C-alpha cells in the first residue's frame, strides 16, 4: 500500500511538473502596440540642418515601447517600438529548450511579462536609439525616424540588462545577465569589441565623468530571496573597471565593508548607485534595504547609512515579498551633487535627501505602498530635476530637487523602468 501511494504521488508530481514546464515554455497570447515603419525617412535622409533637440526617453519594459518627451514642456513628442522584429524574436525565444529559459525570465524576473526594453541611449548624431532588450538577449540600433533596426547584436547568455554609453558616445556597455560578464559594443558597427568579468547576474554600469572608469555591480540570483539561501545567490561584487583596457581595478565584497563599518545587513548586492562627479563617494542601494549607504571610494570604506521610513503596512515584509530582492531601486544625484533622489520601490514614495545632513522629504505616490512601484531615478540634463519612473502607474514623475515637489507627470507605457536624457534629430 505504501509503495502504491509513493508511486502515485511520484507520478502525480511528474505529471504536474510536465504541465508546469509546458505552460512555462509557451508564448503568452498577448497583443503589443503596433507601429508603421517609414523607410522613406531613414537616417540617410535626415540632413544635419535638422537641429538636435533635447529629449527624455522612457523605456516601457512590458510593452516594448520607448516614449520620447520634451524636457521643458513634458509633452510627449513621439513613441518608438523597440521591437519591430518582434514576431521573429518571439518565435526564436519560444522554440526548443530556449523556451523554458524564456518562460523563467518572464515569470520570475518579468513578473509574468516578457522583458522587451530595459535600457536605451541616443546616438551622437541623434539618428538612432541603442536599446538593450532582456528577453531577446540582444542590443539593437533603431532608426528613430524610420523605426527600422539598423544593426542587431546578440549578447552572450540568455538575457541582456542594464547598460551605459561612454561619454564620447562610441561604446555601449551591456550586462550579460547569465554570462557573468559585461560586453562592450562599437555603436558604429554593432560589433562586440571587449568585455570584462563580473559576478552572478551583472547589473548596473556607470561611466565616470571623464570616461576613464566604469563602476559596475553584480546582484546575484535575486530569485533566491531568503538570507538562508545566501549560498545559492552567487558572487555579488562592486567593481571599478578601466574603461580602455576593461581590466578590473578594484573588486569589493560590500558585505565585508558593511561589517567593517558596524552595519550588519542580510545581503551584499549593490543595486542602483550614484557616483559624485569627483568620484570620491558612491551612494549605494543594497538588496532588501530600505535606504542607502555612503561608500568612500578613495578610502574603500562605508561611512554612513540612511534608513528611510517603511510604511506600517510594510513592517512585516519578508525577503520573499520584495520585488527581485529590491527594497529601494533607483537613485540619482542633483547636478551640484548636493541632493539625492530615491525611488522607494517597495514603499510607494520618492525621497529627496540632503546629501550633507541626510535630512529628507517624502513624496507619497499611492495609498497602497506596493501600487506605485517607483523603479528608477535619473537627473535632468541641467541637474535641477529628477525623473522617476513610476512603473506600477505607467508614468514618469518629474521632481524639483530644491522644493522636493512633483512639478509634472508624464503618462508613458506599460511598466516604465530606465529613463535617460538624450538628443535626437526628428523629421516631422
Can you annotate each of these PLM segments?
Residues 1-10:
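N-terminal Sec-pathway targeting helices
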Residues 13-428:
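Predominantly soluble domains enriched in secretory-pathway, periplasmic, or organellar proteins
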